[in-house]
Amino acid sequence: MLSRVSARSYSSAAQSIKLTAREAPGNLSTLSVVVNNAGSKAGKSGVAHLLSKYNFLNNEAKSALRFTRESELLGGIVSSDVTRDSIVLKTQFLKQDLPYFVEALGNVLTKTSFRDHELPETVLPAAKAQNAEAQGSNAFKAFESLHEISFRKGLGNPLYYDGTSPISVDEIKQFASEAYNTSNVSVFGSGVNEGDLKKFIGESAFSALPAGSSKTTPVELHNGKESRIRAAGGSVALIGVPIKTADFAKYEVLSAAIGSTYLPGSSAPLSQIPGAISKVLKYQDAGLFVICVCNSDAAVVAQGVKAAKKAVDSVSASDLSSATKAAELAVALQSRFESPVDVKIDASAAKSPAKLSEFNYVAVGNVDLLPYANEL
């Protein structure tokens, strides 16, 4: 029989782990572990991405092969990925198998073996393949460049490992020991009874997580920068403003007023420009207000980004006031159970309008046809 519950119990430490659970109809459950302050913004560039690829490999409890076969036999699906803020582990399975997958996730956080041969044989190939696939998108290149010029370090680090600087197994192991602690770990369960989840976590290796403090990464906001990248394929132009967390609400109102990516089909100005959207990228310590214009035709992008800049400059106080309800809806649409968005939209968000007097600009693609920032 498959082992469904860890034999050891560390219930006192488990009480420090942040748990959120909700029951749902049907026989399917999902369990997500979010490790905050463990994303690409933290540590050496690329180390978080490589750590995410070590997850679900060999650990002290069982081999990667055994876990893969067992989880497949149970019909489970597992994944591990990195964001700028966090490492996120996700599992999907039948409800009755909750103890097994709680145990598996706890083993990842506390018992991963970090064997030397896994780095060149499994981890590096997987990480490099993911980066190569992402780099095939000019939009990805543009957003990476925008983060780099807007934040430089931290949130400006590359999202994925690019092979520029070698990273050792010891460096990955050290990063894991600093990131995987009770202050950083949150568990979200859907289709899960909260009492059951607490019980199984208390009986699993989750309880072996050490106590720790959440380290904040210093954030610097830089404006007035420009980046141009010549690349084959479609063209992309980005206007971006790095913003403080306190300003998320007013930039959500501005986004709704000109045309938010979360509100397609509206009559907002950007909806009249081919390939144009706006959004607010929100992180724990800062964010980015972004206007994006993409098209296979660079001339269309050139015309579109100029029109988009004109549209945002033309937004009136009345437009912002009228957009507050739309902004509330956009925020609600962004909020997910595993990643709640805590931004309060009210009338005050429209009283101090967001400004685009200074901004960062990125052009990727056929840059011979794309305008410079001072031409917008």
Curated annotation (Swiss-Prot):
BP GO annotations: mitochondrial electron transport, ubiquinol to cytochrome c
InterPro entries on file: Metalloenz_LuxS/M16 (IPR011249), MPP/UQCRC_Complex (IPR050361), Pept_M16_N (IPR011765), Peptidase_M16_C (IPR007863)
Pfam families: Peptidase_M16, Peptidase_M16_C
Compartments, as annotated in UniProt: Mitochondrion inner membrane
Cellular component, GO annotation: mitochondrial crista; respiratory chain complex III
An annotated Gene Ontology molecular function: metal ion binding
Superkingdom in the source lineage: Eukaryota
Membrane topology: Peripheral membrane protein
SUPFAM superfamilies for this protein: LuxS/MPP-like metallohydrolase
Keywords: Electron transport, Membrane, Mitochondrion, Mitochondrion inner membrane, Respiratory chain, Transit peptide, Transport
Broad class of the protein's primary localization: mitochondrion
Presequence positions on this chain: 1-16
Family assignment from sequence similarity: Belongs to the peptidase M16 family. UQCRC2/QCR2 subfamily.
Annotated PANTHER family: CYTOCHROME B-C1 COMPLEX SUBUNIT 2, MITOCHONDRIAL (PTHR11851:SF209), METALLOPROTEASE (PTHR11851)
Quaternary data: Component of the ubiquinol-cytochrome c oxidoreductase (cytochrome b-c1 complex, complex III, CIII), a multisubunit enzyme composed of 3 respiratory subunits cytochrome b, cytochrome c1 and Rieske protein, 2 core protein subunits, and additional low-molecular weight protein subunits. The complex exists as an obligatory dimer and forms supercomplexes (SCs) in the inner mitochondrial membrane with cytochrome c oxidase (complex IV, CIV).
Main function: Component of the ubiquinol-cytochrome c oxidoreductase, a multisubunit transmembrane complex that is part of the mitochondrial electron transport chain which drives oxidative phosphorylation.
UniProt name for this protein: Cytochrome b-c1 complex subunit 2, mitochondrial
Species per Swiss-Prot/TrEMBL record: Debaryomyces hansenii (strain ATCC 36239 / CBS 767 / BCRC 21394 / JCM 1990 / NBRC 0083 / IGC 2968) (Yeast)
Origin organism lineage: Eukaryota, Fungi, Dikarya, Ascomycota, Saccharomycotina
Gene name per UniProt: QCR2
